[in-house]
């Protein structure tokens, strides 16, 4: 699995901790944020290779975050994987075309399988460094 800089946006500390530890153990450089605005501010300084995004966060939901993210020239093509407890509700709200426009490359419903998520993260990061083709949805 390739190494990459990953930003994890998740307001639930327990879930964020699991993600950060799993990604870090897989060799990724991980930054964690409980607030979307803090992540947007950090992206102005250092653009990651990938973002894992919870859609339901206080102060700024995932849709607002994605819209603000895409206004940043350096982050227009930045891949995002949604990790959300909204599950089927979210899948109904975000169709494939909307996902493509927002740069969403995958959606994982909570509770998610860590090994599957890690494999998918690795494929997204490897794809970015190799061919620019999108991996199949998980």
Where are these regions (language model features)?
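His-Asp phosphorelay/catalytic-motif detector in bacterial-type signaling
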Residues: 47-49, 74-81
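Charged docking surfaces used in two-component/phosphorelay signaling
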Residues: 17-25
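C-terminal output helix
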Residues: 109-121
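Conserved acidic carboxylate
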Residues: 10
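Active-site residues of response regulator receiver
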Residues: 54, 84
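Receiver (REC) domain active-site loop signature in two-component systems and cognate sites
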Residues: 57
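Acidic, metal-coordinating helix/loop segments flanking the phosphotransfer/catalytic sites
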Residues: 32-50
């Amino acid at each position: 699995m390739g190494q990459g800089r990953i930003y994890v946006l998740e307001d639930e500390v327990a879930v964020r901790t699991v993600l950060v530890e799993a990604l870090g153990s897989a060799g990724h450089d991980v930054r964690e944020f409980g607030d979307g605005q803090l992540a947007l501010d950090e992206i102005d300084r250092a653009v990651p290779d990938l973002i894992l995004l919870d859609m339901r966060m206080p102060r700024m939901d995932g849709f607002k975050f994605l819209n603000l993210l895409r206004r940043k020239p350096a982050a227009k093509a930045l891949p995002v994987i949604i990790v959300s407890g909204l599950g089927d509700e979210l899948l109904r709200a975000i169709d494939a075309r909307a996902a493509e426009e927002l740069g969403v490359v995958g959606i994982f419903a909570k509770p998610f399988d860590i090994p599957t998520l890690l494999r998918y993260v690795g494929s997204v990061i490897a794809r970015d460094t190799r061919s620019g083709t999108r991996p199949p949805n998980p």
